[in-house]
């Protein structure tokens, strides 16, 4: 009768210790994270500003391969006939304008109006039956505080229509070019073991949160501790977070050189 050979307990302990040591040396999120992020834009454009500026910009964009044009005006309503693409217009009342918020990036701009009941109205769903807009052309000249960005995300373009006449053609051309798929390097990697943001449920270092101009870094509350997360679609590689990080937990990663075929 065959007997099962019992392994010495010391072998089990050594093997377990070795496996644990290897596991700790591997940073799974870093190793499995792709080097690039991809934006997908179908060309649904939101234009925001005074009626005269928005109408002029929309007419210049008509017939240039965009999927739709949505006009949000802040003074009077407009009625712009559709040509090759659908055109939708909506007048933001003086009450609605402070409630407008825009968040996201190229191919994924969520535009909402705060409601009295606490729910937010998704304007893309209400106006064009989509979840998001792909591109935003902001012609408000800062009159509306729709987002907290110091550095706007890809796909969000600003233009003072009356004062920047010389730049109109270039900005409008940029809008038409933001249709399709676009790759951008993932500029960072985070070692959570080194991060001093939270320990034992207490929030510690917040330097990276304070310095990011793209508002790409957030503190995410876990079951016990908080952790730092960087949105790769908002990060634009400024690198202020890596300079501010006292522990080296955030490392700037240069784009990989393409191999010659």
What is each PLM-predicted segment?
Residues 1-218, 261:
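Ferredoxin-type iron-sulfur electron-transfer modules and their immediate structural context
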Residues 197, 229-230:
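A generic structural signal for short
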Residues 62, 149, 203-228, 236, ...:
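Iron-sulfur cluster-binding cysteine motifs and their immediate structural context
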């Amino acid at each position: 009768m065959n007997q099962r050979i019992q392994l010495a307990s010391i072998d089990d302990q050594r093997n377990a210790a070795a496996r644990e040591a290897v596991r700790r040396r591997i940073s799974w999120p870093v190793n499995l994270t792709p080097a690039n992020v991809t934006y997908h834009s179908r060309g649904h454009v939101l234009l925001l500003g005074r009626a005269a500026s928005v109408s002029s910009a929309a007419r210049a964009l008509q017939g240039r391969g965009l999927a739709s044009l949505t006009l949000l005006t802040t003074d009077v309503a407009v009625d712009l006939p559709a040509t090759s693409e659908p055109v939708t217009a909506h007048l933001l009342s003086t009450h609605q304008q402070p409630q407008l918020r825009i968040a996201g990036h190229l191919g994924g701009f969520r535009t909402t109006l705060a409601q009295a009941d606490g729910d937010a109205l998704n304007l893309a769903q209400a106006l064009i039956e989509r979840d998001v807009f792909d591109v935003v052309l902001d012609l408000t000249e800062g009159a509306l505080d729709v987002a907290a960005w110091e550095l706007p995300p890809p796909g969000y373009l600003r233009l003072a229509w009356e004062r920047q006449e010389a730049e109109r053609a270039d900005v409008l051309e940029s809008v038409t070019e933001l249709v399709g798929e676009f790759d951008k390097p993932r500029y960072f990697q985070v070692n959570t073991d080194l991060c001093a943001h939270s320990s034992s449920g207490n929030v510690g270092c917040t330097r990276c949160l304070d310095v990011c101009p793209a508002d790409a870094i957030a503190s995410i509350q876990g079951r016990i501790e908080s952790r730092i997360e960087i949105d790769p679609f908002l990060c634009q590689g400024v690198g202020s977070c890596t300079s501010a990080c006292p522990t080296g937990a955030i490392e700037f990663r240069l784009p990989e050189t393409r191999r010659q075929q």
